[in-house]
Amino acid sequence: YNHKGEKRKPKFDIKNFKKFKDKIIYLLINEKIPGMYKIDSLDNDDQKNGSHIMNALKRENFQRNCIVRGLNDATDEDWIIISDLDEIPNLKNSDLKNIKSPIVFFKQLMMYYKFNLILENYTWIGSKACRKKDLKSPQWLRNIKDRAYSWWRLDTLFSETK
């Protein structure tokens, strides 16, 4: 399904990645997503647009959380990296085996759709990682904040992602 919920043919073909076929765990998620908003023909444009946006977010979160289905062979000490397709952390200088912190934030270059469109001297937190034993859900890890918030920020007082 695409972000609009329209059925489409899968675009991934393992034959295009023969070199990595032993490293790729491909999951085709083809089930109904719970809690989707119904879009009624009597809804006004704002209601329809709002429902489309919320449904796209629900689809994305559901798909991301399905990642755990591919982690059956991972040990509790294995690191799980959650990122979008265009967020590729550079692990060349990272030795995850020696990191004691339960969560790792990867500073990444800000690129706009292509590798040659880089915002110079600007990094941002894209990918995040934790050990399998610490992973509550992939979406939980995605939502974790990379900074501490002041005590007076009531919106973060009871948050599990601060």
Give the predicted meaning of each segment.
Residues 3-82, 91:
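Active-site-proximal specificity loops/subdomain of glycosyltransferases
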Residues 56-60, 87-162:
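Conserved catalytic core of nucleotide-sugar-dependent glycosyltransferases
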Residues 1-4, 110-111:
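Short beta-alpha junction loops
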